[in-house]
């Protein structure tokens, strides 16, 4: 991902304020509510029968934290996202058979959640930088797909 120095600073400054537990759980939960067909990958998570069930599901929250921790790791390696996410790309492609479009959807949901959490601090410039990052991460995760 090519970010200007200003964009990198904006991404890093905001990310320093992110509560990975809360934001991760909310982002994954929203993905499952807004795009219900994505739930098929999480059937082992138990009750996903309603928006409140999804948003309150401890397995959704725990996996959301895991997802956002990996995203956080990616922020430390913006110059090598494909390398950083190679193993996860392989896992999601070969073993889990996740549609790579879901990575783009989750990235966009993450941007919505960040805007929700940070309000005025999530300026159009910050959003622009984050859109580049989530697109780069989605592309890296889709890299191993044939």
Swiss-Prot record:
Q: Which residues carry this modification: Phosphoserine?
A: 44
Q: Which InterPro entries does the record associate with it?
A: Globin, Globin-like_sf, Globin/Proto, Hemoglobin_b, Hemoglobin_oxygen_transport
Q: Which UniProt keywords apply?
A: Acetylation, Heme, Iron, Metal-binding, Oxygen transport, Phosphoprotein, S-nitrosylation, Transport
Which residues are reported to carry the modification N6-acetyllysine? Answer: 59, 82, 144
Q: Which GO terms describe its cellular component?
A: blood microparticle; haptoglobin-hemoglobin complex; hemoglobin complex
Q: Which GO terms describe its biological process?
A: hydrogen peroxide catabolic process
Oligomeric and partner information: Heterotetramer of two alpha chains and two beta chains.
Biological function: Involved in oxygen transport from the lung to the various peripheral tissues.
This protein is called Hemoglobin subunit beta
Q: Which organism is it from?
A: Nycticebus coucang
